[in-house]
Amino acid sequence: MKRLRNKMTTEELAECLGVAKQTVNRWIREKGWKTEKFPGVKGGRARLILVDTQVCEFIQNTPAFHNTPMLMEAEERIAEYAPGARAPAYRQIINAIDNMTDIEQEKVAQFLSREGIRNFLARLDIDESA
């Protein structure tokens, strides 16, 4: 089953629902959905849709939603059956990100989008070959 994330591009939402991107863009304008700039894309045309309760309710009432059996409700958490199986580094990174402010998280996301993981590791002085 597919899962709606809390932020999606128009292309991702259109693909999930099986409609055209133009249809999703029209819904954004008509319904006044909240959007934000997509980090790392020049020109300001790429936008992220903030999938809130208003968006979820509208999507659930569309015929496209009912004709798509692979779609679940937004923001449903995936059950983690083996929480202790994660590597310590993974847990530390997640904890660090959880402790960041929204602005700090956005800056990290922009940096990773712009520079990539290799430059991120290089900034941390971590050698890939080791």
Swiss-Prot record:
Q: Specify the superkingdom.
A: Bacteria
The record's InterPro entries line, in alphabetical order, gives:
Cro/C1-type_HTH, DNA-bd_dom_put_sf, Lambda_DNA-bd_dom_sf, YfeC-like
**Signal peptide range in chain numbering:** none
Q: Pfam family of this protein, just one? A: YfeC-like
- Give any GO molecular function from the UniProt entry: DNA binding
Provide the protein name.
Uncharacterized protein YfeD
Gene field: yfeD
